[in-house]
Design a protein with these regions (language model features):
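Accessory recognition modules or surfaces
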Residues: 113, 166-174
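Short acidic/glycine-enriched loop/turn segments that link adjacent beta-strands
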Residues: 91-93, 139, 161-167
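Conserved catalytic-core motifs of GNAT/GCN5-like acyltransferases
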Residues: 132-134, 147, 152-169
Length: 175
C-alpha cells in the first residue's frame, strides 16, 4: 500500500488501539527499527496486553492510498495508521513508554508529539507522577522530540541494545 498524498499537511487523529490494528503496528515497528531492536510479534503483543497498558494509534485522515485490486492499481480514500505509542503504568506511580513508532514518511508532522502528550495525560489520569523511557544514544530525532517535551537524560545504559552493541539513554519527565 502506498500513500499518494503529501503527509506533512495531513489531518490526523489519535485513538485507542483495536485488535485489528496489530499486524499494521507490527509492520510499522519493523520499518522504524532495525532487526534486533524492532520487536517480534510475540514481544509487541505482550506489551499491548500488559496490565495497565496504554496503546494509542495515530491515523491520517482521508488519505489517498494506492491499492492493487485484481491486477490493477486503484486509488482509495482511507484513514491509515501512521504511528503508535505503547506505555504502561507501574503500580500507578510512574509510567514507562515502551515504544513510539512513526512511519518515516509521516515524521515531523506532529504525530509523535501528539501521541506522547495524549499518552502522558492517560498515565497521569492513572496516578503516575513521572514517566520513563529509553532511546538509543544515536537516535537524534527521538532525542530532539523527547527534550522538546521536557524529558531529561538520567543515565546511559551500556549496550542496552545488545544485538547492536548500542548504548541507550534512560530519560524521565515529571508529569
Amino acid at each position: 500500500m502506498k500513500v499518494a498524498s503529501h503527509i506533512a499537511g495531513a489531518e490526523f487523529s489519535v485513538r485507542d488501539y483495536r485488535p485489528t490494528d496489530f499486524e499494521t503496528l507490527w509492520r510499522i515497528d519493523q520499518r522504524c527499527f532495525p532487526r534486533g531492536i524492532s520487536y517480534s510479534q510475540l514481544e509487541l503483543n505482550s506489551f499491548i496486553k500488559k496490565r495497565h497498558a496504554i496503546t494509542l494509534v495515530a491515523e491520517l485522515q482521508n488519505e489517498t492510498v494506492q491499492v492493487k485490486v485484481t491486477g490493477s492499481d486503484k486509488n482509495v480514500i482511507s484513514d491509515i495508521i501512521a504511528g503508535f505509542v505503547i506505555a504502561h503504568s507501574v503500580r500507578h506511580k510512574y509510567g514507562r513508554i515502551l515504544t513510539l513508532d512513526i512511519l518515516p514518511e509521516a515524521r515531523r508532522a506532529g504525530l509523535g508529539t501528539r501521541l506522547m502528550t495524549d499518552c502522558e495525560q492517560r498515565l497521569q489520569s492513572q496516578g503516575c507522577t513521572e514517566v520513563y523511557l529509553e532511546t538509543a544514544v544515536n537516535n537524534e530525532p527521538a532525542l530532539r522530540l523527547y527534550r522538546k517535551l521536557g524529558y531529561e537524560i538520567l543515565r546511559t545504559l551500556p549496550e542496552y541494545y545488545a544485538s547492536h552493541s548500542l548504548d541507550a539513554f534512560q530519560m524521565a519527565k515529571r508529569l
